[in-house]
Amino acid sequence: MAIYLDFENHIKEIQNEIELALIRGDEDAKEILEKRLDKEVKSIYSNLTDFQKLQLARHPDRPYAMDYIDLILKDKYEVFGDRHYNDDKAIVCFIGKIDNVPVVVIGEEKGRGTKNKLLRNFGMPNPCGYRKALKMAKFAEKFNLPILMLVDTAGAYPGIGAEERGQSEAIAKNLQEFASLKVPTISVIIGEGGSGGALAIAVADKLAMMEYSIFSVISPEGCAAILWDDPSKTEVAIKAMKITPRDLKEAGLIDDIILEPSKGAHRDKFSAANTIKEYFLDALRTIQQDPHFLDNRYQKLMSLGSFVESMN
C-alpha cells in the first residue's frame, strides 16, 4: 500500500478516485482524473519547500541501494567482509555489469521491514563497512573497473563499539584512498547523505544527487537541537544549512543533479533506476575520454578548501 506524505493528500484523494473509476469500469472518468492527477502532481512538486524535500529523501517507499542494484546491475555477484573484523550489512558491495560494462558497485543500504532494518543497522555503517568498501575499491583498481557508489545514510553508526574499532580512522582512510584511486569513480546520493557516513563513499570524479535527496554535515533536527535547543526550528535549520541539490550545486560542492520522475523516485523506481544508469554511463564515458581525470579529481577536491595547521 502506497504511503502518502501530508502534502500529498490531494494526490492520494485523486488516486483513490481513479481506483474507484477502474472498479466501475468508467474509462472516461479515469482519463479525466489521470489528467487532473498529472496537473496536481506538477503543481505540488514544482513548489516543494526544503522541508518537504527532506521528507521525500526519507520517504519509506523511496528506492534504496539494493532496489537500484537489482534493477540496473546484471550478472551480479555480492562480496562480503572487510578482511579485518566482520561483514557489515549496512554496506553492500557487488561486481556486475551495467549495460555490459563491468563495474564495482558499493552502496549504503537501510533495509525494509523491522528484521531487515535491524540487519542493515538502519543504513548506519560500522568501521568494518567502510573497510569493506575500501577493499572493493582496491579490487576495482587492481582489475581496472569503474566504481559506482550509492550513498544513502543518516550517518555513520555512533555506537561505542564503532568508536573503539576506529570509526573516524576508517572514514578518514576512505577519503584519502578514494581520492587517489586510478579508476573512474562516480557517486550518487540517492536519499540521505549524512555527514562523514556519506562522505566515506562520496569522494569521486563525479558526485551527483538525486533531485529529492539531501547532503549535510548533520541532520537538521540535530542542528536545531544544538543551535537553538528547539526541535521546532528544524525548518529554519534546513534553510540555513543549504542541504538541497540546488544549493549544493550552486556552491560547487556537487557536480550534477539527477532529475527524478514527476511523482518522485518513490512512485516510479523503474524510471529512477534507468535515469541513474544513464547518468552513470554518460559520466563514465566523459571520464574515460579524459586522460587527465586523476589530476582533475585532485584539483576539484583541492578547490573545496584546505586545512592549515599553525604552531602560533
From Swiss-Prot:
Main location: cytoplasm
GO molecular function: acetyl-CoA carboxylase activity; ATP binding; carboxyl- or carbamoyltransferase activity
Domain CoA carboxyltransferase C-terminal: 36-286
Enzyme Commission number(s) from the entry: 2.1.3.15
Catalysed reactions listed for this entry: N(6)-carboxybiotinyl-L-lysyl-[protein] + acetyl-CoA = N(6)-biotinyl-L-lysyl-[protein] + malonyl-CoA
GO cellular component, one term: acetyl-CoA carboxylase complex
One GO term (biological process): malonyl-CoA biosynthetic process
Keywords for the protein's UniProt record, in alphabetical order: ATP-binding, Cytoplasm, Fatty acid biosynthesis, Fatty acid metabolism, Lipid biosynthesis, Lipid metabolism, Nucleotide-binding, Transferase
InterPro entries noted in UniProt: Acetyl_CoA_COase_a_su, ClpP/crotonase-like_dom_sf, COA_CT_C
Cellular localization per UniProt: Cytoplasm
Classification via Pfam families: ACCA (PF03255)
Xref: Gene3D superfamilies: 2-enoyl-CoA Hydratase, Chain A, domain 1 (3.90.226.10)
Pathway: Lipid metabolism; malonyl-CoA biosynthesis; malonyl-CoA from acetyl-CoA: step 1/1
NCBIfam families: accA, AccA_sub, PRK05724.1
Summary of the function given for this chain in its UniProt record: Component of the acetyl coenzyme A carboxylase (ACC) complex. First, biotin carboxylase catalyzes the carboxylation of biotin on its carrier protein (BCCP) and then the CO(2) group is transferred by the carboxyltransferase to acetyl-CoA to form malonyl-CoA.
Family, as annotated: Belongs to the AccA family.
Stored HAMAP family: AcetylCoA_CT_alpha
Subunit: Acetyl-CoA carboxylase is a heterohexamer composed of biotin carboxyl carrier protein (AccB), biotin carboxylase (AccC) and two subunits each of ACCase subunit alpha (AccA) and ACCase subunit beta (AccD).
Protein name in the entry: Acetyl-coenzyme A carboxylase carboxyl transferase subunit alpha
